[in-house]
Amino acid sequence: MDVLAEANGTFALNLLKTLGKDNSKNVFFSPMSMSCALAMVYMGAKGNTAAQMAQVLSFNKSGGGGDIHQGFQSLLTEVNKTGTQYLLRTANRLFGEKSCDFLSSFRDSCQKFYQAEMEELDFISAVEKSRKHINSWVAEKTEGKIAELLSPGSVDPLTRLVLVNAVYFKGNWNEQFDKENTEERRFKVSKNEEKPVQMMFMQSTFRKTYIGEIFTQILVLPYVGKELNMIIMLPDETTDLRTVEKELTYEKFVEWTRLDMMDEEKVEVSLPRFKLEESYDMESVLCSLGMTDAFELGKADFSGMSKADLCLSKVVHKSFVEVNEEGTEAAAATAAIMMMRCARFVPRFCADHPFLFFIQHSKTNGVLFCGRFSSP
């Protein structure tokens, strides 16, 4: 799984840098479900198409496709397991034009490794019906949070292959922010601009560290059950978030976020309440990273999927996150706060300017989500 965690982590940071080229924009996506969806397509790719995909997804480090697909099988089983104290719904499906005659071996592998189906639709003569069908499937899989994945006109009678990838997550904090402490504060979008934000506050014991080389504090906020953590990277006010993003490699990310190397200390945390819903057309992003052949008819080689001449027509990724006060240990935590207020100096972690955040699965080190909060 480590090789896969490295591949997915490298891809995650490359995507973060590409999607975040515009400094002022918020970014939120799920690198794990994106890798997962593309790995499924990679199973059916051959030749140069496969080589480009392997490079963009950082699979070339891992020496071979088979291990990758088995790795995803274990990862998905682990992350989507029932009985967890968080809700995570990933929806992956390939929708293909029904006249293309997809190989049963490919369909079986999708099911076996990716818990995903290949569904055939009639894009040629029932394009709008196909679009609505895809949208209702996604809405059902994401508890209604993601309703209109494909906008009108986004598929047409020439569409051959649509890769749909949506993900919904809801987790409660291991320790809750008391709603009574939430108040309107100013968020410094840039040196010259401020916006109002609902700022949550809590004083408690968390793992945190300071990375001197990028002048950045890192704080770990665990979700209930401690299977998932939110890792927040907050640069000093004198340091641009861009600098942090430039320096970030997967190796450094692992080194900087090692829980066993962090101090557990009492800290005053101020974090904005926010909701992000981002949608990305991934074709241009993936092309800019070097995966060009897959989207071009005549160049794309998906002969492991179908004998028909195929190319990827559409890769859409939409994700939704809401960060608020909710948690479970409210009563105990609140009482404790009152007693600690007058204690010794407590370090502050005040996220009132742009920061990066990652939601990570502790057991597999998988980065489930990746985001940048630049502006309320």
From Swiss-Prot:
Keyword Phosphoprotein applies: yes
Pfam families assigned: Serpin
Swiss-Prot/TrEMBL site (Reactive bond) positions: R341, C342
Location of this chain's protein in the cell: Cytoplasm
Keywords, alphabetical: Acetylation, Cytoplasm, Phosphoprotein, Protease inhibitor, Serine protease inhibitor
Residues annotated with N6-acetyllysine modification: K195
MF-aspect GO terms: serine-type endopeptidase inhibitor activity
Residues the record lists as Phosphoserine modifications: S151
GO CC entries: cytoplasm; extracellular space
Principal cellular location given in the protein's record: cytoplasm
Source species, domain of life: Eukaryota
Classification via CDD domains: serpinB6_CAP
Annotated positions of the N-acetylmethionine modification: M1
Self-association and partners: Forms a complex with the monomeric form of beta-tryptase.
Job of this protein: Inhibitor of cathepsin G, kallikrein-8 and thrombin. May play an important role in the inner ear in the protection against leakage of lysosomal content during stress. May be involved in the regulation of serine proteinases present in the brain or extravasated from the blood.
Stated family: Belongs to the serpin family. Ov-serpin subfamily.
This protein's name: Serpin B6
